[in-house]
Amino acid sequence: VFDILKAKESFMNYVRQFDLTNDKIHLKLVHTLEVVRTTEYLCLYENITGVERDLAYLIALLHDIGRFEQIKRFNSFDDRNIDHAKLGVQVLFKEGMIRNFIDDDQYDEIIEKAIAYHSLYKIPNNLEPSLLKQVLLIRDSDKLDNFRVKNIESIQTLFSISDADFYSQRVSQNILKDIENHTLILKENRHNEVDMWVSYMAFVFDLNFKSSYLFIRENDYIHRNMERLHFIGDLKEDMLFVEKTCQSYVEEKCM
């Protein structure tokens, strides 16, 4: 049913129509391929094999396909412009592009819903078990690769602001409270770019597989992501609190 190599080829053909010299487009291309790799890691450790594994790979390949059109239109990752998950579903299923990636339509509903739900703050209750597993896999893989992205990309590429503007901010009190309470941060509750940065670290509070925590620990992502930025004064104090809280949460989950 699945020809992952053909699907990858179709994906690359689709992406070539966009401006690959645009940092944001390039970021999302690499991110997609890395999410496939992270999915391989999770499937290996969670003993997910056969059709279930191939389906997870395909969903990983397609999960952010709406991002390319979003960046082309707005040159931004901000979902207040347009919801990239809904846009992905539209491109694949309303415009029929899904058949470029898989001939058989029996998995369409799972693929469509996994893409639609991958970036929601909270997924719907009572999902059918095979769908739930795919949704949890893509949500974890996506979040895990975000730690890699935050480890290498510039402030300018990530947030479209200067380093000086970024470092002049403080973490909002409600955001620090969410960290203290081990809570995933709602987009609407973020007030500035350092809040956004902290919200990415808070992804650790919404992972579903033990292997996801092992992956973060193996790569030392919490510490490395905090260490690479040059926080000073009060902002540094805020960030040390965030780092310590997230780090100890990961350690606990690895036990």
Task: Locate the predicted segments by residue.
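Hydrophobic/aromatic-rich structural module bridging two neighboring secondary-structure elements via a short loop
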Residues: F68-I110, Y121-I123
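Acidic/His-rich, divalent-metal-binding segments that scaffold phosphate/diphosphate chemistry
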Residues: V1-K86, E128
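Divalent metal-dependent phosphate-bond-processing catalytic cores, especially two-metal-ion Mg2+/Mn2+ enzymes
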Residues: D23-L29, L33, R37, Y41-E52, ...
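A generic short-segment signal for beta-strand/edge and adjacent turn/coil regions
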Residues: D3, I25-K28, D79-H84, D103-Y107, ...
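Alpha-helix boundary/interfacial micro-motifs
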Residues: F77-N81, K113, E153, F159-S160
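Acidic/histidine metal-binding catalytic segments
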Residues: N47-L58, I98-A116, S130-L137
